[in-house]
Amino acid sequence: MGGGVVAGFVPPPYPYDRLDELRAVTDRFDGGCVDLSVGAPSDPPPPEVVAALSTSNAERGYPASIGSPAYREAALGWLTRRFGIDAGDAALAACVGTKEFVASAPHYLRLRDPSRDTVLFPAISYPTYAMGAELAGCRAVPVAVDHQWCLELDSIDPDDAARALCLWVNTPGNPAGGLEDLAAIAQWGRDRGVPVFSDECYIEFTWGADAGASILHHGAQGVMAVHSLSKRSNMAGIRAGFFAGDPDLVGYLSEVRKHAGMMVPAPAQAAAVVAFNDDAHVDAQRAVYTTRLNRLRELFSTYDAEVALPGGGLYLWAASPDGDGWALARRVAEEMGALASPGEFYGPSGQGHIRVAAVAPDARIDLLEQRMAARRGDTVRK
């Protein structure tokens, strides 16, 4: 046998690693980089949640992969209390945050049905939907989105639908904040026998509505809602989420995941129970994000970028005046010391935009405003 390198899957550069050059530019500013590129919360979780991590007395035993009864009860109670969802015959199981679930679900689904080899996902979306397909050896097929950043179901090729393991939808959407018609999407999937996986991690941050929408409002058959505490409760470091919906799908995936050892640590489950049972901290966080989105919109509008407030989510999706997202990202790095994500990270059709995450502490946004005020003063003096 030869000693050559065997050709195979080579992971692409991680999107945010490609920002190192721009980060170096922002680091030169007094006060350093103001990072608006990643949606990692900066505000603290409720103190009761943090306390539960150290008082659960649950460190020694192996936790249930599906989640403890208290964990699942708290998650179901949150869905009912907060969104009026009658879970009915829906099943529910824990996941270790949602990113690992998004990345691994296609692999597990294909093991069950090797005749299907396609994952459908929004053309502008979280990169892990496509990566999950690639890691499973599947075709990653983007679905066109309309001017409101919502899926154009009529654009899906019938041959792709016939080969689809699943259709991913994300509402409120990342990066553009679109709000999907989940009733139509659920029906599309049922009519074609395609499971619909709805990533709803921003559901609490639906703007202009009393409550967010879940695909579970339209029944559990053939659908799955995926949720996380990362954004809702500022618990991205805890890695706690759940998937709920079609009992057959939940049963299959939870059994496979149990064999794979996918478990939310028991102390994290205890903390999650506390978080799911409290809504006051979420209401306070909603007010914080609303203010930040408006402040950042005003800042980025000075670049002649088209910046609308999102229907939901934590991001501004700003259109570059010259159609070059990288150029706009470089400009804000050089002039404001801020790091934003070029839109191409979320699909080729996003290349004319940047994504701005409203998660930086208020003091860092103060700093951006001070820098821009100083820059305007310099411009006037010149």
Give short role names for the model-derived ranges:
Residues 147-208:
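Active-site phosphate-binding strand-loop segment of PLP-dependent enzymes
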Residues 107-169:
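PLP-dependent aminotransferase-like
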Residues 2-100, 275-276, 378-382:
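N-terminal small-domain helix-loop-helix segment of the aminotransferase-like
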Residues 269, 273, 289-297, 307-319, ...:
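Conserved glycine-rich beta-strand-loop-beta hairpin in the small C-terminal domain of fold type I
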Residues 29, 136, 191-192, 303, ...:
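Helix C-cap/helix->beta junction micro-motif
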Residues 221-290, 375-377:
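Conserved core segment of the aminotransferase class I/II
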Residues 331-340, 346-382:
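PLP-dependent enzyme catalytic core of the Aspartate aminotransferase-like
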Residues 117, 191-195, 221:
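A short helix->loop->beta-strand "cap" motif at the edges of active sites that frequently abuts
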